[in-house]
């Protein structure tokens, strides 16, 4: 099969086009992702070319393909090519942006209670040596997008009342876990109205739903490509609006593209970066080379985009299918477990909430935690788990899923319950979610019967 083959139907037929063990059910695209066999062949071919003539490939061929990759990604996210550069992952992209900010004492970096842990740690680390403060907007799920926006506005007003300036807000498109789609479009509009710069963590965005940066107009945006775009890991795209590119003084680590304030960038005379820099902006040149790095995943972006177009039927078809499958599959699991899906409270029958407008779904398991808030019922069949039992229960559950059912599902304890996150994908179908639901039911019953040690 080549990328020019006719379209393959979604579901089980599509699985044959991917590299996974047919006995393995990948319900966790939002962590490691997956890629087709043609992309796997592409990366091996590039490795062979690199090893056959290392310097010639690096200097003359690699840059051309990387430029093609940037052009493809820019078209995908509706942005100028000059605003899109390649980085290894979202964490690197976000920290690079933060590292380049000239913070002042009264500046505040705003995060949400759902901000990804690695980003939280990075901000805390940077705050130890930089003159800025942090504030977190607290809220609990489930809730509504309207309430999140309202709490955000209230928090911004309080920051200003304290004599501080909300300088930069880190917003998410989709919360990692428990996974829901955030009202990031509305939050962006609030920030733009109030003059707050925005850094959008779109880790789970590109390849899962349409991203239109021309319409959204964030200051900074970064998304992994290896989660949903069928690109080998690690690979991500960093968008910096042209109006903000003067802020980006250095990559991490600082390399040849750096331009000192009192001089010019000193590129090696023999490097193809010299000729490239004649047409590229200083921002593009800055990211053209960052020490000795593995660019192989980035080189596969064009092949992945062709596969999505020619074999999958295009981006719109992919988005529609995985959104539908996450909805149907999540509802199926909740029905099997007699629980619920995480979404806005109080939705009427047949009403789709915005928080499920994506290809990921979070389902509550029938495992309550005794010390949880009042959201947990007074009685759960088998008895609620004690705090000491939660860790062993989660480990037992994930190990049983892996060993018995050949799958992996991220599990989290949240607000007095245990929850599971599942991802739809083009090679999955409702029967895969049904399998997951039945498997979770069996294992949860074992946990409630305290059979974990048997």
Swiss-Prot record:
The protein's job, in short, is: L-cysteine desulfhydrase-like protein; part of the gene cluster that mediates the biosynthesis of loline alkaloids, potent insecticidal agents composed of a pyrrolizidine ring system and an uncommon ether bridge linking carbons 2 and 7. Lolines are structurally differentiated by the various modifications of the L-amino group and include norloline, loline, N-methylloline, N-acetylloline, N-acetylnorloline, and N-formylloline.
Tell me how this protein is used: Loline alkaloids show broad-spectrum anti-insect activity, and different lolines may have different biological activities. In vitro tests of NFL, NAL, NML, and semisynthetic loline derivatives with long carbon-chain acylations on the 1-amine have shown that many are effective against both fall armyworm larvae and European corn borer larvae, but the effects seem to differ depending on the modifications. N-Formylloline reduces the weight gain of fall armyworms by deterring feeding, and does not significantly affect corn borers.
Q: What induces it?
A: Expression is induced in loline alkaloid-producing cultures as well as in planta.
Keywords, in A-Z order: Alkaloid metabolism, Lyase, Pyridoxal phosphate
Gene name of this polypeptide? lolT1
What does the record give as cofactor? pyridoxal 5'-phosphate
Q: Which domain of life is it from?
A: Eukaryota
EC number(s) on record?
Answer: 4.4.1.-
The record's section on SUPFAM superfamilies has: PLP-dependent transferases
Quick one: a GO biological-process term for this protein? Answer: alkaloid metabolic process
Q: What is this protein called?
A: L-cysteine desulfhydrase-like protein lolT1
Family, as annotated? Belongs to the class-V pyridoxal-phosphate-dependent aminotransferase family.
């Amino acid at each position: 099969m080549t990328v020019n083959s006719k379209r393959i139907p979604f579901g089980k037929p599509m699985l044959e086009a991917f590299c996974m063990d047919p006995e393995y059910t990948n319900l966790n695209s939002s962590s490691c992702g997956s890629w087709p066999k043609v992309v796997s062949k592409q990366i091996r071919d590039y490795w062979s070319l690199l090893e056959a003539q290392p310097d010639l490939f690096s200097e003359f061929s690699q840059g051309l393909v990387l430029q093609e990759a940037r052009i493809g990604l820019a078209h995908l996210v509706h942005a100028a090519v000059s605003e899109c550069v390649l980085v290894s992952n979202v964490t690197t992209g976000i920290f690079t942006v933060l590292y380049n900010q000239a913070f002042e004492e009264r500046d505040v970096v705003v995060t949400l209670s759902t901000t990804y842990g690695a980003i939280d740690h990075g901000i805390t680390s940077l705050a130890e040596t930089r003159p800025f403060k942090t504030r977190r907007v607290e809220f609990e799920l489930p809730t509504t997008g309207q309430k999140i926006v309202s709490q955000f506005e209230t928090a911004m007003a309080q920051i200003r009342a304290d004599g501080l300036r909300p300088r930069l807000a880190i917003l998410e498109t989709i919360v990692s876990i428990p996974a829901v789609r955030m009202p990031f479009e509305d939050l962006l509009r609030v920030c733009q109205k109030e003059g707050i710069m925005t850094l959008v963590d779109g880790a789970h965005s590109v390849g899962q739903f349409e991203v239109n940066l021309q319409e959204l107009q964030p200051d900074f945006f970064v998304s992994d490509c290896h989660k949903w775009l069928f690109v080998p890991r690690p690979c991500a795209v960093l968008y910096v609006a042209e109006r903000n590119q003067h802020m980006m003084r250095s990559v991490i680590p600082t390399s040849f593209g750096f331009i000192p304030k009192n001089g010019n960038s000193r590129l090696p005379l023999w490097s193809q970066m010299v000729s490239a820099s004649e047409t590229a902006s200083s921002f593009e040149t800055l990211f053209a080379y960052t020490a000795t790095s593995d660019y192989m995943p980035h080189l596969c972006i064009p092949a992945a985009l062709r596969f999505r177009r020619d074999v999958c039927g295009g981006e719109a078809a992919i988005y529609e299918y995985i959104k539908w499958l996450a909805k149907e599959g999540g509802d199926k699991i909740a029905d099997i477990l007699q629980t619920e899906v995480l979404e806005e409270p109080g939705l009427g029958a047949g009403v789709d909430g915005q928080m499920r407008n994506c290809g990921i779904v979070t389902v509550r398991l029938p495992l309550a935690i005794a010390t949880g808030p009042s959201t947990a019922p007074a009685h759960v069949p088998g008895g609620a788990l004690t705090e000491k039992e939660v860790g062993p229960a989660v480990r037992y559950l994930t190990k049983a899923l892996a060993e018995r059912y050949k799958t992996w599902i991220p599990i989290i304890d949240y607000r007095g319950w245990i929850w599971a996150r599942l991802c739809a994908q083009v090679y999955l179908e409702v029967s895969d979610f049904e399998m997951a639901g039945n498997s979770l039911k069996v294992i949860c019953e074992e946990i409630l019967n305290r059979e974990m040690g048997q």
